Amino acid sequence: MRIQLLRHYFALTLLLITSISSASPFGLSTVAAVVSANTASTASPKTFVFSAIPDQDEANLQERFDKVAVYLQDQLGIEVRYIPVKSYAAAVTAFRNNQVQLAWFGGLSGVQARRLVPGSQAIAQGTEDPFFTSYIIAHSSTGIEPSDSLPAAITGKTFTFGSKGSTSGRLMPEHFIRENLGDTPNNLFSKVGYSGDHSRTIALVQSGAYEVGAVNYKVWDKQLADGKIDSDKVKVIWRTPSYPDYQWTVRGDVNNSWGPDFQARLTEALLSMDDPDLLASFPRSGFIAADNKLYQPILDTAISVGIIDADQ
């Protein structure tokens, strides 16, 4: 269809040049120059768009990732824009529909997105992401103390995960709960909720709305350092074993739109990011190379928990 449209366009262009050049006082060269300029305009690279899973407050993410967009624009020499999404599922959908070409995904959402878009690649991850962990946190009223093993005393309590699509706020905590306590969350807890993001999980447990919850350790540590957590009301009672988590994933067709070396240049720009203010957007100390096979354990776990269908 696109080829046919181009043929019609150039046929009409030739007819226009032929008819106008004989009558126009500006002559053939002027008309040709106008056509050339219009053709160049239509061939200009489109805006490169990226997003990120909404694992924290949306307003903060917008402010921080807008700065990342400026950085990438300077590095790549094209227009770059960040767009927020309302949920983890919305981030995956935007990637699938090519509304965004790059996304800062969690381990699970990245696996889901790459399964939907063949050829897409994990290209960079945070320095901390190969060894990511989750915290199990509890309200002080439970009387549960920190332990090196998952406290069985959480059984029967109300429990909130983060987003249903979160690696650190749902998938891996659920996996370790099943592994350590021998049953599903719905059977173990008196009530199971999904807060939507890590910041809300902390707020819900701190307020006592839920007695226990699972949270991304980076979000907890940052909020604690920022003075947003009341340690008299909520505390970490267990830290999970490590697992691979967040990564930058890019669609496999970006080179078709921005040039044969675009993915390589994009990867280099991400790996070279060293401005502490930009890195605080994630928050990470830096980025290292990543690839799809690093996230096979996440896929395997998602299949075993029942979040991903192995036959899809």
Describe each PLM feature range:
Residues 9-22:
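Bacterial N-terminal signal peptides
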Residues 26-28, 33, 158-179, 264-312:
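Ligand-binding clefts/hinges and TM-proximal coupling segments of bilobed small-molecule sensing domains
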Residues 36-65, 287:
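Extracytoplasmic "Venus flytrap"
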Residues 49, 53-54, 128-135, 228-270, ...:
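Periplasmic-binding protein-like
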Residues 66-77, 168-194, 222-230, 304-308:
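Ligand-binding cleft/hinge of the Venus flytrap
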Residues 82-93, 106-108, 184-203, 244:
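Short helix-initiation/N-cap motifs at beta->coil->alpha
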Residues 104-117, 178-179, 204-207, 211-231:
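A ligand-binding cleft/hinge motif common to bilobed small-molecule-binding domains
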Residues 126-182:
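A conserved helix-loop-strand patch within extracytoplasmic ligand-binding domains
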